[in-house]
């Protein structure tokens, strides 16, 4: 900024010098032109007076010779005096112009000095104002930064507190939800346990009922098998005595069919009880037991019938029984 001010002052000084030089040059030219004009006027006056003096000279040339020479000299002296006066006048004007030019230059220098001092003062004031404004701006900036820093710290703390509060609320809500879920799960577990126990009790009761029915059916079947075996044996004996019938195996087949009929459970009865697999297992065990009883009874009856036949054969035969089925003919006695 100072260099720009210096350049402005230098330009002002140069302009002032050029103006003073122009003024001096113009005044010198006017003075010189005035001198030339004065000399020309003096010459014209001298020629006019010379011509007028020559016209009046006539008859008395001799008388007026001395006087004429004096007039010419007088005219020449007058012209010289006029030229000197004009010279002095224009010389004074030139001196006055030079003095005025000098005064103008001095005034210009004074004005330039004053302007330079004024410019320097203004520059100092401007610098001081700029420095003051800069300091004020820096102070305001620092204040704003401090306020912003405090505001940011407050907002950060508020955000941190809000986040902590939200986290605490979320934790409490999660705990409450977990407690509710745990209670609901425990309640569901108790309900499921009670339902399972109830179903198990119902199943157990159903199995017991089915087992009891199966035992009853097995008992009935066993009794029926025994009755059928006895009836079959009696029928076989009658048929043997009469030479008719299908024999012991046919009778046993009838007994087997009766056992199957007794052990067969209708689909409606099957659907009345729980646990189809357990029921089938119980029924299978009951059927096996019934079959075992059946075959034991069969063997027992077979042995009894064989013993009875042998006894009858012994009673009827002395030397031997003609019947091919007689046991003693085969070495079984």
Swiss-Prot record:
Coiled-coil portions: 3-52
- Which of UniProt's keywords are assigned here? Coiled coil
Locations of Basic and acidic residues compositional bias? 116-163, 172-219, 227-241
Q: What induces it?
A: In seedling leaves, by salt stress.
Instruction: Write out the ranges of the annotated region (Disordered).
Output: 1-20, 116-246
Q: What is one cellular component GO term in this UniProt entry?
A: cytosol
Q: Which GO terms describe its biological process?
A: cold acclimation
Keyword Coiled coil set for record: yes
Family per record: Belongs to the LEA type 4 family.
What this protein is called in its record is Late embryogenesis abundant protein 1
Q: Which organism is it from?
A: Oryza sativa subsp. indica
What is the primary gene name for this protein?
Answer: LEA1
